[in-house]
Amino acid sequence: MKIKLVSDLHLEFSDCFINNNEGADVLILGGDIMIAQDLHDHHAADFNPYSNGALADLSRKMQRVARFRDFFKRCSFQFPHVIYIMGNHEFYNGKFYAGIDYMREEVAKYPNIYMLEQDTKIIDDVVFVGGTLWTNMNKRDPLTMHAIEGMMNDFRIIRNDKRNYAAMSALDVAIRHDKTLGYIKLIVEEHKDKK
């Protein structure tokens, strides 16, 4: 099985064309591909004509969403299987759990694109397991968690929709890391006799 891995495309800034000249069976989109919130925000119902710069903002979001969807169509057409794993940037300007839902809804439109967020996909007897792994914050070290919250954009622009939309915290990220890592270890153990 041939696997092609790409990440950090940041389609919110410009388009990117991925070809399959290698004849890969699986394309893995390994995070920081797009912003999930844009898939939700571009709807006309969200448009406020009285806000400053609203038309330009709506137009930019619509262009980004069109770019995201064209990218997915091209990937779906060129590769027999596409695995999508969200990175931290997918959650920017949005809500953590809702962002996962927006991406699942979008990916479900393509029969050969699979999102792995504490999920497993078996392709030709090969087990793929994945999820956004985040970080354990140096084993939840309080000094690390305090310092990192002041330094990284993630903790200013990602909201935790299970905590009254408060900003994501270092503890939120460490908890999610532990859950995802636990899931991956469980699946690896369950499928230890497989590829």
State the predicted function of each range:
Residues 129-194:
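Active-site-proximal loop/helix segment associated with metal-binding centers of metalloenzymes
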Residues 97-116:
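Glycine/small-residue-rich loop that forms an oxyanion/phosphate-binding "nest" at active or ligand-binding sites
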Residues 14-22, 70-76, 115-124, 183-194:
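Short amphipathic alpha-helices and their capping/turn segments at secondary-structure boundaries
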Residues 1-4, 120-130:
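Beta-strand-turn-beta hairpins that frame and shape the catalytic cleft
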Residues 1-84, 91-98, 163, 167-170:
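N-terminal active-site segment of His-dependent metallophosphoesterases
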Residues 36-37, 92-94, 123-128, 136-139:
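Short catalytic/ligand-binding loop motif for oxyanion handling, primarily in non-cytosolic enzymes
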Residues 81-83, 114, 127, 195:
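Proline-centered loop/turn at the N-terminus of a beta-strand
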